[in-house]
Amino acid sequence: MAQIRLKNFRKYESLDSLNLNNINIFVGKNNAGKSTVVKAIMLALDNIRSLRWKDVTSKEGMQSILISPKPLFRFDANGFHNLHIGTFERAKCNWLDDRRIVIALEYNGVEFEITIAGLMGDGQVSMPIEKLKISVPFHSNYEFDFSKNTMTFSLGEKLANDPSSETQKAMWWTNDEIAMAEKDVEEAAASGDALKVAEIQQNLQKLISRRKALQSELKQLEKKGEIAHATFDLSYFHESVGENILVQYIKTFIMIADTPITMKKNAKGYSDHVSKVQYLDENRKVIAEAADKLEKVLSNIFVDYIPAHAATQKLILSVDDKQDINSRIVHEYFQENILPGESADRFMKKWLKEFEIGEEIYVKPLDGEGYYVKVDTEDDKVHLADMGMGSIQLVILLMRLTTIGHRSESSLQPWWIIVEEPEQNLHPMLQSKLADLFEDFTQTFCDPYTHTLIVETHSEYLIRRTQIMAAEFVEDCGEDMMDEMIPFRVFYFPTEKGRQPYDMQYLPNGMFANKFDPGFFDEAGRMHMEILKKSKKG
């Protein structure tokens, strides 16, 4: 399950782990911290995916050399969206007297924890990473402490415990079989069946031999269990300039296992060092698996940010206008070349009808200069620019979701999609349908992975619709399956300093277990009561 945790980042002195679902609704007053979490996610993932070795050319002899491999964290990373952070000083929590920022998140089955230490007042755009932890849950863990120049490997809980427990189970079964065989020998001897006694005794000897082998294996596993982790001086295995530095750091553990031990046998710490190297050697397959998984994850980080934007009624959308989000979305949708009958095409047509916009859209290029968009309604083909602001807003959103869905089918990887206030310009009924749209998106484009959506919203109607859908999921599948079947999770962000965002938690009937702060769900009712009071006075 995707998650995010923060310390000393912008609004948050400390943000407890937010465990995300497929579709996550962030709600709260302005400046409550919703965008802070979103920015932390994009900033961290942008940095993680782009860490590479730096290759420079020396002045002497023009030979290629490597500069220090200590990775840098860039606060001006804007690969997914312009985050407007820029420096360490703007990233940290202003009122907390701590020079360390921690961002921890889980992405596609790998957990990352990054610690950056900086100084205030220097306008530092990038800072060396002080500590980096990488975990493949239940598999293996890696920690690189650049302040102490150490690197540590340990097995995940499942791998650390399973071998011994499986051997122990085999021991129990063997002991049971031995006890039964001994009883059978006694019964056969009492009946005077010498042939059967000999047959059972032969099997009994095999069982006893198996037990001895299992006892020996258990002793070896117990000996291995004495090493909970292996820590070494920080070093690195450099294979290629283009490979992500994190993958190469993990591969370094295999390099250490392959390097002959030069320490003298009578040197202090020799036995401990040998045990740690053996621990790496015994787990080289585990380390190689982690490196392969990490390489795949880092090569396929897909994040898309769909900002709240003004619906434009420009007839021609220029390809040269890089600042116009509408132009970019239309351009990329056209370039995707979605064919009739594909799932992305069916998705687009379905939701054009659901939102009562039309039957189909047509994007027409203008000699490489730009595009115009027409919508096929029941009566005619209408320029999108001539439609209402709400329809324009929805078509742009649908084009972006369709583009992402089509791309995800090619990449076969999950995406993180962040949608900012999609309810702008929409009638309340259409706002509620956004919940159905997002749920259908995750169902249509979910093979083989499920995407993670984060929706920042102030729409009561969208949230109310998720409650109805949650209750319907429970009716269809039963209360025991509600956690698996409900794709939504609503997080409320309080504005008060020190308070944590919290999961509203759906009940089986669709109601929330927790309450919103005053001013959200209760605001319409409060104003209605005010009107009633005034009408009575009149």
Regions found by a protein language model. Name each.
Residues 1-91, 102-103, 341-523, 527:
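Switch/communication elements of ASCE P-loop NTPase nucleotide-binding domains
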Residues 1-299, 470-483, 491-492, 537-538:
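P-loop NTPase switch/coupling surface
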Residues 3, 63, 124, 168, ...:
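Residue-identity detector for glutamine
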Residues 111-113, 314, 498:
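Residue-level signal for secondary-structure boundary sites
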Residues 133, 305, 396:
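Short hydrophobic beta-strand segments that form the core of ligand-binding sensory/regulatory domains
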Residues 133-143, 328-339, 518-519, 523:
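Short, cationic low-complexity segments
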Residues 185-201, 205, 209-212, 216-223, ...:
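Extended helical coiled-coil dimerization/tether regions that scaffold
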Residues 528-538:
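A cross-taxonomic marker for long C-terminal extensions/tails that follow the last structured domain
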